[in-house]
From Swiss-Prot:
The chain crosses the membrane at residues 23-43, 58-78, 96-116, 126-146, 155-175, 178-198, 201-221, 265-285, 298-318, 334-354, 367-387. Disulfide bonds: none annotated. This is Na(+)/H(+) antiporter NhaA. The gene is nhaA. It comes from Brucella melitensis biotype 1 (strain ATCC 23456 / CCUG 17765 / NCTC 10094 / 16M). Keywords: Antiport, Cell inner membrane, Cell membrane, Ion transport, Membrane, Sodium, Sodium transport, Transmembrane, Transmembrane helix, Transport. HAMAP family: NhaA (MF_01844). It comes from the Bacteria. The lineage of its organism: Bacteria, Pseudomonadati, Pseudomonadota, Alphaproteobacteria, Hyphomicrobiales. Residues 1-387 are annotated as: Na(+)/H(+) antiporter NhaA. Residues 388-736 are annotated as: Peptidase S49. Na(+)/H(+) antiporter that extrudes sodium in exchange for external protons. NCBIfam families: NhaA, PRK09560.1, PRK09561.1.
Length: 736
């Protein structure tokens, strides 16, 4: 069957596009632009909600950043190994110039960022963000120049970007690793050893390597090391038989896998990452975000640090004779490529997500990355488009006094950077004015046209999820599923589950308890503080109806305590209560027989009259417990307590008065407080007791392990009725 030229033309156009060098960068740009548009459209909420839709144990955003990006790093590892063994990096002379330039491009941006953020340890964690180069974006921009850019420059940029990626992988593995699980890490090492043995035994089928790579990813993901490192490790174990002079040889497993992954990664994996992480909302932004040291550190690190670091290191290497300048490329063109190295979209955002757990810091990171990358792309492209190839074969920077082009290039650098400074200042002022105009005119959603002229104001980060634990009920042992109570045995498991969420910056605890057993109260308090220290998380406590006596003791575990104005808070005292039946047995004709081997063994027997010495002994115990309670309050509320003589008398107050006395930190509700702290997109995740295979709740909040059996309920019915009466009495003290 014959096809007309018209029917074949669309297919050939698409094929030419997919095969072009610029295709990957253009696709990534389009994905990022689409994310900006969607995030500022009526579909914005659907976009953000979809990213946090849970699929199995992880949200969609985590699947993209932890699993899908492992495939990207697998391809990066394959490219690094191929280039080192059978490509541009196979010989030391070829490695010198891009290697030295890459080192300068990693070190100087990190120094600029550290200088601006040295006094803030939390922000300093992002020192590596401006050190990365996005190979797809940078090569995409360079490819738009066509024949204006000599092939030697493209090889130089590609090689430099690969070494830059290698540095980023090492940085992620060393500096952005969470707490280590040695069993999983050991299993990962064993799996890597299996891959190594297969390589040494000349196993050439890909399937065993791919299966082992998936297993390796699982172990690395659970070990605490970032899961994307598994992709690089697996890539380095896949065999490549060097074939000098035949870089396109497709006989080795590495070549086959690299060829199979190239287009899916370029046109599926990386664009999905860009679309998922480049969503920007322009609503409710302050102009001061652009002036924050975190944003400026990344912006200046990418735009200035990269170009000065890469070009300065390359110039020094060429001047000292360690390397040669790319053939046919002028100094201006080499400087233009150095500017393009400041495009750090994919890898910079990825490191930023690892560096900062909070929504605000991730937002500032993305603003800095986009601004620095955009400036680098525009300025680098314009400079390369205006430059002429091989303008200075005589090395103008080497012989500045002999070549007029050297003087012209020096003047150009001065004018270019002065213009860059003026442009940056002007853009900042324009953005501040635009932000003020948007707030006055409420045109936050009428921005698609401005995207072409203004640097975006906000990248919407993956929303923060805060685990929520409900501690509701009286504090005593022996609770059941029908009558839940609080004790260490019933709360330990659910607390550990909440604090184990490694992505959450804090744990929220809802308390509604009138108190109860002081020992159980202190044990729960201690467990919360120990878990917070172990996992380095903040604890926010929110009081509902009441946090009194032992309930307030548990609330002291919070770094901040928030209550409703009508909540009941306080009752810092100790009470003991029981029933006395000294005349009951006589009336019903029952004789009670008690045998002891100690004179004080029947202290406070409810069937005997009270003794003065027994009451004094009980009050002495109460004073000791009360003193411990007071010490806890003074320690946890140091510098916040008011001067009130009734503070430790056992009185209780409303939330409003408790705030003025320093017993709590503020008034409000959980959702409003957490939105103010972590941003509007914060998500609350209620931690539920674990369920068995048949869906029945396992022992958790308020129940003992055997509390669900009807026979046990019947057997302990008498005790249960007394406990219910005691519990009702505790609640009744506060009118509840």
């Amino acid at each position: 069957m014959n096809h007309s030229p018209q029917s074949a033309r669309p297919v050939s156009i698409m094929r030419r596009f997919l095969d072009s060098e610029a295709a990957g960068g253009i696709t990534l740009m389009a994905a990022a632009a689409l994310a900006l548009i969607v995030a500022n459209s009526p579909f914005a909420q659907t976009y953000f909600d979809a990213l946090h839709l849970y699929i199995g144990p992880l949200s969609l955003a985590h699947w993209i950043n932890d699993a899908l990006m492992a495939i990207f790093f697998l391809l990066v590892g394959l490219e690094i190994k191929r280039e080192m063994l059978d490509g541009q990096l196979a010989s030391w002379p070829n490695r010198m110039l891009p290697g030295i330039a890459a080192a300068g491009g990693v070190i100087l941006p990190a120094i600029i960022f550290a200088v601006l953020n040295h006094d803030n340890p939390a922000k300093l964690r992002g020192w590596a963000v401006p050190s990365a180069t996005d190979i797809a974006f940078a090569l995409g921009v360079l490819s738009l120049l066509g024949s204006r850019a000599p092939s030697s420059l493209k090889v130089f940029l590609a090689t430099l970007a690969i070494l830059d990626d290698l540095a980023a992988v090492v940085i992620i593995a060393i500096f952005y690793t969470a707490e280590i699980s040695m069993p999983y890490l050991g299993a990962a090492f064993i799996t890597a050893a299996v891959l190594f043995v297969m390589n040494r035994m000349d196993v050439v089928k890909l399937l065993p390597y791919l299966i082992s790579a998936v297993i390796l990813w699982f172990f690395v993901f659970n070990s605490g090391v970032h899961a994307t490192v598994a992709g690089v490790v697996a890539a380095l174990m896949i065999p490549l038989k060097p074939a000098p002079g035949r870089p396109d040889d497709m006989t080795s497993p590495l070549h086959k896998l690299e060829h199979a992954l190239a287009k899916p990664v370029a046109f599926i994996v990386v664009p999905i990452f860009g679309f998922a992480n480049a969503g920007i909302s322009f609503k409710g932004l302050e102009a001061s975000v652009l002036g924050d040291t975190l944003t400026l550190g990344i912006l200046l690190g990418l735009f200035l640090g990269k170009q000065f670091g890469v070009f300065g290191a390359a110039w020094l290497a060429i001047k000292t004779g360690l390397a040669e300048k790319p053939m046919g490329a002028s100094w201006v063109q080499l400087y233009g490529v150095a500017i393009l190295c400041g495009i750090g979209f994919t890898m910079s955002i990825f490191i930023g997500l690892l560096s900062f757990p909070s929504d605000l810091m991730q937002t500032e990171t993305k603003i800095g990355v986009l601004s620095g990358s955009a400036l680098s792309a525009i300025c680098g492209y314009l400079l390369l488009r205006a430059a002429r190839p091989d303008q200075s074969a005589a090395n103008p920077l080497w012989k500045a006094d002999e070549s007029p082009e050297a003087k012209n290039f020096g003047r150009f650098l001065c004018v270019f950077h002065f213009a860059s400074y003026i442009a940056s200042t002007y853009c900042t002022e324009r953005l501040q004015a635009a932000s003020s105009l948007l707030r006055r005119s409420s045109l936050e959603f009428a921005l698609p046209g401005l995207l072409k002229r203004l640097i975006p104001r906000r990248f919407r980060a993956v929303e923060t999820e805060i685990p929520v634990v409900r501690l509701h009920g009286a504090i005593m042992t022996g609770g059941t599923s029908l009558r839940p109570t609080l004790s260490l045995a019933s709360t330990a498991g659910i607390l550990e589950k909440a604090f184990a969420d490694k992505h959450a910056p804090a744990v929220a605890i809802s308390i509604n308890s009138p108190g109860g057993a002081p020992v159980q109260s202190r044990l729960i308090y201690r467990r919360i503080r120990d878990l917070a220290a172990e996992h380095q998380k903040k604890v926010f406590v929110f009081v509902e109806d009441v946090a009194a006596s032992g309930g307030y003791m548990i609330a002291l575990a919070g770094d901040e305590i928030i209550a409703d104005p009508s909540s009941i808070v306080g009752s810092i005292g100790v009470v003991s209560a029981s029933f006395g039946f000294p005349e009951l047995l006589k009336k019903i004709g029952v004789e009670r027989r008690v045998y002891t081997a100690g004179s004080n063994k029947v202290t406070l027997d409810p069937f005997q009259p009270e003794k003065a010495e027994d009451i004094e002994r009980l009050k002495a115990l109460q004073l000791e417990i009360h003193a411990t309670f007071i010490d806890m309050v003074k320690e946890r509320r140091a510098g916040k307590l008011g001067d009130n003589p009734d503070l430790f008398s056992g009185l209780f107050w409303t939330g409003t008065t408790a705030a003025s006395l320093g017993l709590i930190d503020g008034l409000g509700d959980m959702l409003s407080f957490l939105r103010k702290t972590y941003g509007d997109k914060v998500k609350l995740k209620l931690i539920q007791p674990q369920r068995g295979l048949l869906g029945r709740k396992l022992p958790g909040i308020g129940m003992d392990s055997g509390s669900v059996e009807p026979a046990q309920i019947a057997a302990h019915l008498g005790d249960g009725l007394l406990c219910v009466a005691e519990e009702k009495a505790i609640w009744a003290r506060y009118g509840l």
